[in-house]
Amino acid sequence: MLSQKSIQIIKSTVPLLEKYGVEITSLFYKNMFEAQPQFLNIFNHSNQRNQKQPVALANTILQSAIHIEKLNEINLMPIVHKHVALGITPEMYPIVGAHLLGAMKTVMQDEATPEIMAAWTEAYRAVAQAFMDAEEDLYFETEEQIGGWKDTREFVVDRIEEETPLIKSFYFKAYDGKEIATYIPGQYITVKITLPGDGVDVPTDKMRTYVRHYSLSDKPNDEYYRISIKKELGKNTPNGIVSNHFHNNIKVGDVVPMSVPAGDFVVNNDSETPILLICGGVGINPLFSMLKETLVQQPDRKINFIFSTHCESSQPFKEELKQLEDDYKETGNLKINLVYSENQGHINKEIIEKYSTQHVDQAEIAETDVYICGPVPFMMQVNKDLLQLGFHKENVHYELFGPLTPVLEENQMLRGVKNIIEN
């Protein structure tokens, strides 16, 4: 727990963080990568170039200062899971802290008084210790589970299926032939790919390890992991390095190192309330896993699945969705609604109202479990529309691909105020 004096001092720095936040975090990353180049193998540098990462971290620090007295209420687990997937160790925290606090002092200069620096040092140590304790527990849990492991394990590509012109599904089996860990629908695996530098962050004559998280897109099973990767083609930006490598170069028989499944954006199959799954684009992946597993575990549960994409040719899992619709037609509990923006326009309040209330009454709306995944503007609009329609904000859950940024309202945003090391 922080002292009351430190809490008051940190709150007093909010105007400074509003003024200097992104400058601080940009300098932090620059200095840390120069001094610790091995960290280049942990962080996604495209998020550095487009400023998503510095902006996200600056917002995290700002929100931490605003809500500093509520730090013990913050859910650390989304970032704890990500840290375990990345292999973050306790030895890294002092390094990160030194560079972060050093950047604060450099940017704020005389405004960073000894009292302010002492308070932020105390706060960083408290947050770092909370992360280290939680990560130690999760490392043990994931390694000791049946089929579990620590760090990375080699998996071989068993088959590849083209879902759309830009999305391919890759099926992985354990290279050693041993059991694999199960997972909860909504979780992701983390792949580590070593490639020549991109010529921007790393020279082309040097190798670099790229780390990416990919949501598992099938229901849990004991044979394989499936991830469905969209080929990211940049618009006035470079193409996605790892996604293009998978599409252009990875073939059946190739071996890929990966971390154990992780993530806390997971479906609650202990609840019997209706479930609403709303996804856009490649955000379908974790929600499709949730859909398939919920149908197996809770065939009598009311499920509404809404998927928005540009057109029919950009829709993955066509045959699987059709088969699910046919298999559960008689129960009347499953509703699948496809929204093609090419014809219907982007998803909006009217569309959500039309489809989300198909087989639930007004009383059930307030208790419906909602899961959202897709582009940030999509999720912000969907969340706003859902709240206006009477869905309860405590029941709205979301997954963000990339650095954590606030998607929902302030009290929900506290879920995102959690990281010092962020991928």
Swiss-Prot record:
It comes from the Eukaryota. Heme b binds at H83. GO terms for cellular component: cytoplasm; phagocytic vesicle. Residues 150-268 form the FAD-binding FR-type domain. It comes from Dictyostelium discoideum (Social amoeba). Pfam families: FAD_binding_6, Globin, NAD_binding_1. Its EC number is 1.14.12.17. GO terms for molecular function: FAD binding; heme binding; metal ion binding; nitric oxide dioxygenase NAD(P)H activity; oxygen binding; oxygen carrier activity. Its cofactor is FAD; heme b. PANTHER family: FLAVOHEMOPROTEIN, FLAVOHEMOPROTEIN B. This is Flavohemoprotein B. It is an enzyme of class 1 (oxidoreductase). Keywords: Cytoplasm, Detoxification, FAD, Flavoprotein, Heme, Iron, Metal-binding, NAD, NADP, Oxidoreductase, Oxygen transport, Transport. Binds 1 FAD per subunit. Binds 1 heme b group per subunit. The active site is at Y93, E135. The gene is fhbB. Induction: By submerged conditions, in growing cells. Residues 1-136 form the Globin domain. It catalyses: 2 nitric oxide + NADPH + 2 O2 = 2 nitrate + NADP(+) + H(+); 2 nitric oxide + NADH + 2 O2 = 2 nitrate + NAD(+) + H(+). Belongs to the globin family. Two-domain flavohemoproteins subfamily. InterPro entries: Cbr1-like_FAD-bd_dom, FAD-bd_FR_type, Flavoprot_Pyr_Nucl_cyt_Rdtase, FNR_nucleotide-bd, Globin, Globin-like_sf, Globin/Proto, OxRdtase_FAD/NAD-bd. The keyword Cell membrane does not apply.
